Amino acid sequence: MGSTNTNMTERRMLLPFQAVANFFKEPSGPKCPECVSVIIDDACPNLDCPLKVTEWITRWCSPEALNIPGLGQPEAEQLAKLGLVLHPGELYGLSPGDWARIEGVSADQLDEIQRQMEDSKSPKPSALLHGLRLPGVSANMAKRLIEEIGSIDSLQETKPNRFQEIDGIDEAMAFEVYRWFRDSVNKQALKMLDQIGFNFTD
């Protein structure tokens, strides 16, 4: 009897430790091919995943968005993997030393990139919105959102039920767009872009 009680006591003492071990156990499931974080809701949750950052910078520089042709996917990939940028707002604060770390970019090319970046600061609202890479928001949907809501500032205050009233936006997408504006990294990007001089009010 005494031995049984001892075993039960030992098992009870182990329970809290087992709970802690389970809490810190690495989650299972498919992993991001770039940063090997476990995929959640069909997306990599890692905010500084180089693949996610590369895709965002590439979208930002595309002709349908901010039109910075000198910054293509190879350059965006290097910027992301070197940890020089987390979002497009940080592109505009890179130092000459940062750019010097990007292979394959000559001094003349860098001058052209910086000219293109300066020209990019007065985009159409829909092009700016498309460049922000909201989930499910294509170039056409960006135009529709601006037509319906009015400005990026207004979009930040829009509730999911209002998004659902727009043709082509279902409940899931409405929530994702709403949630995008409340993400800490996205809010940081918007704040930095606003400080640079991008217009979110028109």
Model-derived features with residue positions:
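OB-fold and OB-like beta-barrel modules that bind single-stranded nucleic acids
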Residues: 1-2
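Accessory alpha-helical DNA-binding modules that contact the DNA backbone or grooves
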Residues: 9, 14-202
